[in-house]
Regions:
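N-terminal small-domain helix-loop-helix segment of the aminotransferase-like
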Residues: 2-103, 110, 277, 289-293, ...
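PLP-dependent enzyme catalytic core of the Aspartate aminotransferase-like
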Residues: 87, 163, 344-350, 354-363, ...
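Active-site phosphate-binding strand-loop segment of PLP-dependent enzymes
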Residues: 144, 149-220
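Conserved core segment of the aminotransferase class I/II
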Residues: 225-304, 314-315, 399
């Protein structure tokens, strides 16, 4: 019998956050080892529970949530999203401009599949959240990575963006606040990106899932509000700010001129209809979440868990000889640099695998985020301070005797 192979469409599709190193971690757990997983931004397992009123509203609406809904989502949920963005300066957004999906991840794939033809290019940051690159590849497109500058607080390199635009470039992806670096972009920088998109007729895809997880004096600006004359698609959801990642509730919002994008919108509607609708019971969480008390503020202020965990992790990482890290101003991650020459590191996946096997702590290598050099890794700052201290101290101990 001939072997059954995966489709050739998947040859260039990678998502190493849940890749080979995670498989090895699962093997270790099956053997009875306890593995501290710092690879996924999943708030609930680290004690960040959803607000009670969100859970109560979902439960109360279960009797009326047993059937399908509109393929774009419940009207009440989409109206709440519409009002949320109108209050943030996107005054022309209507209910019909909003698509609710089974998490932002599903919508990213739909947005790329509806747009890209073979060989079309999409500008994606390096480092990025790797689903963006994977979705472009799955959609027969080519992800062209523009560099973000570590020496400039991980802001995008505007000259590199300009240099990588070609006649095949269809759009640009902006992840703000950024995963994995924690950068929060200034209004001035966003306006520069808007000007580039305007000059080259690019669609802007704005991943803003961490827009309320901000530290110190960081301020988030929605790029769509700065570019009312450009087609911008904004992605957000409940997973991070409202701590219900398992509910799989995300949305995308179309803003700007849409008449010239009629064909693209028809494609989005077709793909939305093909999967019938998003999870209906969980959609009842959206109106309550957006309209109620924003409890995330209890975790991001000085003295609160996320704030103090970020500070402690940053201090400990920078105390390790040969390791440095730009202090994140948003999101749930750090993206430290390792002196690759000092440790003779030429394969960062091997490094995190060796660390896992020795110390039973799971990290993600920097190249998994389409960073071109093997000199970074990502760590999640969701664990309590004592767990972060244990993990980072183990990493320092590991590096002290490590060479490839």
């Amino acid at each position: 019998m001939s072997p059954i192979e995966k489709s050739s469409k998947l040859e260039n599709v990678c998502y190493d956050i849940r890749g080979p190193v995670l498989k090895e971690a699962k093997r270790l757990e099956e053997e009875g080892n306890k593995v501290l997983k710092l690879n996924i931004g999943n708030p609930a397992p680290f004690g960040f529970e959803a607000p009670d009123e969100i859970l109560v509203d979902v439960i109360r609406n279960l009797p009326t949530a047993q059937g399908y809904c509109d393929s774009k989502g419940l009207y009440s949920a989409r109206k709440a999203i519409m009002q949320h963005y109108q209050a943030r300066g996107m005054r022309d957004v209507t209910v019909e401009d909003i698509y609710i999906g089974n998490g932002v991840s599903e919508l990213i794939v739909q947005a790329m599949q509806a747009l890209l033809n073979s060989g079309d290019e999409m500008l994606v940051p390096a480092p990025d959240y790797p689903l963006w690159t994977a979705a472009v590849s799955l959609s027969s497109g080519k992800a062209v990575h523009y560099l973000c500058d570590e020496s400039s607080d991980w802001f995008p390199d505007l000259d590199d963006i300009r240099a990588k635009i070609t006649p095949r470039t269809r759009g640009i992806v902006i992840i703000n606040p950024n995963n994995p670096t924690g950068a929060v972009y200034s209004k001035e920088l966003l306006m520069e990106i808007v000007n580039i998109a305007r000059e080259h007729n690019l669609i802007i895809f704005a991943d803003e899932i961490y827009d309320k997880i901000l530290y110190d004096d960081a301020e988030h600006h929605s790029i769509a509000a700065l570019a009312p004359d450009l087609l911008t698609i904004t992605f957000n959801g409940l997973s991070k700010t409202y701590r219900v990642a398992g509910f799989r509730q995300g949305w995308m919002v179309l803003n700007g001129p849409k008449k010239h994008a009629k064909g693209y919108i028809e494609g989005l509607e077709m793909l939305a209809s093909m999967r019938l609708c998003a999870n209906v019971p969980a959609q009842h969480a959206i109106q309550t979440a957006l309209g109620g008390y924003q409890s995330i503020s209890e975790f991001i202020l000085p003295g609160a868990r996320l704030y103090e965990q970020r500070n402690r992790a940053w201090e400990l990482i920078n105390d390790i000889p040969g390791v440095s890290c730009v202090k994140p101003r948003g999101a749930l991650y750090m993206f430290p640099r390792i002196d690759a020459k000092r440790f003779n590191i030429h394969d960062d996946q091997k490094m995190v695998l060796d660390f896992l096997l020795q110390e039973k702590v799971l990290l993600v290598q920097g190249t998994a985020f389409n960073w071109p050099w093997p000199d970074h890794f990502r760590i999640v700052t969701l664990p309590r301070e004592d767990d972060l201290e244990m993990a980072i101290n183990r990493f320092g101990r590991f590096l002290s005797g490590y060479h490839q």
